[in-house]
Amino acid sequence: MSVARNLWRVADAPHIVPADSVERQTAERLINACPAGLFSLTPEGNLRIDYRSCLECGTCRLLCDESTLQQWRYPPSGFGITYRFG
């Protein structure tokens, strides 16, 4: 599947928000596992999430506990990814 065919309509507010403090080991697990590459560390060592390219697959929810992500929900109706196969 080519992700170039998929369409994103980005919401103004993020649907994934990291906790204020995330263990480095958990952050590295998210950085390595996210298929969209949304996660990175800031120079200060904080977890950064670029929610705009999210595939809404839920991998991050499976890899961490509820204390890692302050918020995870699907984008509002009409926003997020639209998969286009072909």
Swiss-Prot record:
GO BP term, pick one: DNA-mediated transformation
Gene3D superfamilies, sorted: 3.30.70.20
Keywords: Electron transport, Iron, Iron-sulfur, Metal-binding, Transport
InterPro entries, per the entry: 4Fe4S_Fe-S-bd (IPR017896), Fd_FixX (IPR012206)
Domain named 4Fe-4S ferredoxin-type: residues: 45-74
GO molecular-function term, one example from the UniProt record: iron ion binding
Family under the similarity heading: Belongs to the bacterial-type ferredoxin family. FixX subfamily.
Function statement: Could be a 3Fe-4S cluster-containing protein. Probably participates in a redox process with YgcN, YgcQ and YgcR.
Name this polypeptide is given: Ferredoxin-like protein YgcO
Gene name, Swiss-Prot/TrEMBL: ygcO
